[in-house]
Amino acid sequence: MAEKTLEEMREAVEEIRAKMAAAAREAGRDPAAVQLCAACKTRTADIVAASAALPIDVFGENHVQELCANFDAGAYCGKPSHFIGHLQTNKIKKVLGRASLIQSVDSEHLLAAIEKEAAKAGIVQNVLLEVNIGGEESKTGVSPDRLWPLLDAAAAQEHIRVKGLMAIPPVNNDDAQNRRYLAQVYKLFVQAGERGYQNVAMETLSMGMSGDFENAIREGATLVRIGTAIYGERDYSKKA
């Protein structure tokens, strides 16, 4: 499947929105409480700008270079942009001011670096803490038991506000197992909110992608990150 035309993207987003709404209602939730984040990794600014006319709530970027290029080109057309990939400390400065939310904070080292750059810029940066719920070595994210020390560290920062959690459960063809992972993340989300940390407001639970976003919504996600189902297969030859 190649990259989609605008009309194909429109049809895809309509179908995704319908599935999102159905999953929310099935769980007794308001469909309006779940945001659609378009993961636009490797897409050109023209494609991103065209998709901005669709009912997409926010754009998510995995690479700092692409965030900068699309933001500076005005490709998001006024819609929020989030950073959802692994963030290197030497690139934080470029993300601040371009990403309204950094979804992938997974260490005290990264927290401290964001705090330092945000203080220099005179801003408060919103972040999510990323949880590696499956304990996979191939993925970033903090283990569930290390979430609490990370929250302690985040609460002490003056220029960071934690707005929730992000997770990528293991790819699993077992629907029940997938939902168990998602439910575990939701439990952490609720527990974190109940602990009353300073500078922490558990508002956003980012989980669910093209293959499992309906399950994620059933298990409490407030934001789902979808790329391939919107844009088609990625053409990595277009990016260095």
Description of each model-found segment:
Residues A221-K239:
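Gly/Pro- and small hydrophobic-enriched strand-loop and loop-to-helix capping segments
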